[in-house]
């Protein structure tokens, strides 16, 4: 679980990086479909699933909107992300293992875009936070 120190670190990092959240989402999703091509199956209804395509950019923006929501609900991720969990479990039917894959890609992108801000301490806190987000999103699968 997230300590008060972790929560403060996530909020501080988010304040800095949120201005670039659309680019982070696009890059993370683009990276995910290249490095983990099996994830493309969830987007097979899109006409263009190439990195940086309009659909990838738009969905990356949605993903980062969800992360922004999670930051605002950091004290109770399970309740705060309930609707997103329902959507991913019952409508989109996303395998929850993919949340961890995307989290890894988000961490890589933030590390490359914000090397100064992405200290080891920020890394640990953000990793724990994203793991909590993945757990909250997987809640409705049980």
From Swiss-Prot:
Disulfide bonds: none annotated. Heme b binds at residue 88. O2 binds at residue 59. GO terms for molecular function: haptoglobin binding; heme binding; iron ion binding; organic acid binding; oxygen binding; oxygen carrier activity; peroxidase activity. Residues 1-142 form the Globin domain. Keywords: Acetylation, Heme, Iron, Metal-binding, Oxygen transport, Transport. SUPFAM superfamilies: Globin-like. This fish has two hemoglobins: Hb1 (major) and Hb2 (about 5% of the total). They display the Bohr and root effects. This is Hemoglobin subunit alpha. It comes from Cygnodraco mawsoni (Antarctic dragonfish). The lineage of its organism: Eukaryota, Metazoa, Chordata, Craniata, Vertebrata.
